[in-house]
Amino acid sequence: MTVLAVLLMLQGAAVPPYLVFPDSTLDDPAAYEGYSARLYHDSRGNSVETYIDGKTGRIVHLWADALNESIGFTVRNSGGQKAAAAVAFDRGPAAAWSSGGRRSLRYALTVRGTVQIGQFILGSMRIERDFGYAGRVHDPIDAPPFVPQEFTAFVQRMDGVYRQRLTPSIRLESTARDWTLRVSQPSLDARNHLWLSLHGDGRTTRATVTNGVLTIQVRGAQPASVSVEIATDGAALAPLNRRQIFSADFRRFADSAKSPRLEREIRGFELLSSKQKLMAGLPTYATYFGRDMLMTALLMEAVWSDTMPEFVMGAALAKLGPDGDVSHEEALGGQAIRENVAEFLRTGDTTLLRNLQRTRENYWMIDDDFQLPVVAGHYFANASVPEDRKHAFLQRWGAALRKNLAYVARQAAPYAQNPVATSLVSFKRDADGYCHPGSWRDSRVGYAGGCYAFDVNVVWVPQALAAIVAIDSVLRDIGEPGVEQIADVRRAAQVWQGSARHFMVGLDSATIETRVRAKLASLPTEERAHWDSVLERAALHLDTLRFPAVSLDSTGQPIPVMTTDPGMWLLLERQDSSVEREILRPFLLPYPIGLFIDGVGLAVANDAYATPAVWDMYARDLYHSPRVVWGREVNVLLAALATRHRPGAIDSVRTAVARSGLQYAELWSYKFEGGALRPVRYGSASDVQLWTLTDLAVQYLLNTRK
């Protein structure tokens, strides 16, 4: 341990990393391609993640508190403006403390040679995220600061008091003994502040600042330590611990298993959990996401305490829109300021200036509207939850819950009255007329340009209607008023049971051969050769292939992209054995015929049966493409299989995923090197992700139902 690391411990409570990525005992470090991260608890128990992107030299600190804050900078070596630096985490713990309304955390980095540090961004993690999406990390190290265009336009319109808050203040203090770079920035409304300090020993390093860029020259051939201190005066969340989150049965199971994998996932769940919300993921999505919470609630039922659904439902119900729809995502702190400023610029409404940090909600997604009744239905049907708790929940949230149930019934009514494809629940339209992908495949091409999603219309709407009927029954049984117009809901639920017929795609052997060969012919030589060899080894001769399309186009015609979405259908609804076999079959057929990729996992989609225009869509945006495996989809399928006698399918999927070395990631991809397929970490993947951590329930189910 270095002298600097010892000093860090003396200046605050020693805080060892709560999680480290990659962990050589659990991960394949090569698959992380120079990426590393450490996660801590601050003095209030809030999560702090620090990561180093070795490809770009970007170092980001996420503060997962009530403002979703971040502090980031880029480190480059002397090899040129675009050369990432040799920088790494120093050994030893961090230090955490609170003082004068600030929470602080300090740790150490090691640097070699001569490095330049710039591109400082202090503010919302959403702004850091946009900095990355815009590719600005590849700008010269002394490029003008990244400022959201909304802020620039706002400053041009308002007086000068805001201008000085647009960019961070940078000041170097240097003596022969040591040096300290101090960087600070207030929020645009000056209500909150973030601070960053970099400190070095003058005997081992020399520091200068030019045009907002810090240059550190290491004296000698050995690496030198630089301490990094971050601080915030933002509000903290109230964290939950494992005893509050998990059931006693699961905790006993985890304690007896003594599994490093389970312990890491339990810690991950703690890092995401607070009384206010379950955050979607660290580092990029450290805030409320309705879909992520609600889907997690369904998957985690087997392992968490029966109070957790109350936290989840309460968080969603507190944010309902006026019509009863569920908020997909909240905008906090700096991002709330950004969105309120944008609305002010658009409308001129000066009342927005009274509270620029007023939380804003995003209601564009539609799947979460139907997921809330499903979670509520499971909660009220749970006989282990005492009636007095249910009454107490209804006393606080009953009016909001009924508003959501009524909204769902209204959305489902058109199809119940006229069950044709174009009466299904459609995505909302963007300004350009494009059907906004309003479910979990929320990249622009996630649903291949479709308007009616399989998962919304075959899984969530029917499940929501059935849940409303179940909720009505429980409410009446415990002496509460039932759901209004329940007879109409019952009739709608019956009609919606037939919605799957609109999505089914059936292909004969000749069509399968023609389309798969056409897809392979469009690929680069190396990639095509690999998949040709897969098909040759498999030696499959399929008479027919049936699968549900990812979506329907605007005219109600299926877009024949095979996906993992039927896994949720299997999990939530019992099928007869023949239907179950048909649903499961594509998961186990080798890609590019099905979804199974040996040594990687389950491709989240297979576009081989679609048109070249769809292939091009996915080639341009890989997030929900055949090049990606999503941990949530693996968990959904395994959870479904755990309740059925399918040991062969379970073993095949688990083995493929384990061989990737990335089975703990939110999502992962693969690339070709020397003709071989190699799994790799997906660039924007979360290190700790709510959906991925549902593996806890999968492991419990698989190991307790043997």
Predicted feature descriptions by range:
Residues 376-379, 460-476, 566-580, 636-645:
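Extended, well-ordered alpha-helical segments in internal regulatory regions
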Residues 246-285, 325-350, 414-451, 498-629, ...:
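Extended glycan-interaction surfaces of carbohydrate-active proteins
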Residues 214-253, 312, 390-416, 572-588:
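Long, acidic, intrinsically disordered low-complexity segments
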Residues 394-436, 448-476, 485, 489-493:
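Aromatic- and glycine-enriched pocket-lining scaffold segments that form the walls
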Residues 286-419, 458, 628-654, 689-704:
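Aromatic-rich carbohydrate-recognition surfaces in CAZymes
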Residues 289-291, 454, 562:
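Short, surface-exposed loop/turn motifs at beta-strand boundaries within globular domains
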Residues 305-319, 385-412, 474-539, 579-595, ...:
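Extended, well-ordered alpha-helical scaffold segments
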Residues 2-10, 14-265, 275-294, 298-310, ...:
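Terminal accessory carbohydrate-recognition/targeting modules of carbohydrate-active enzymes
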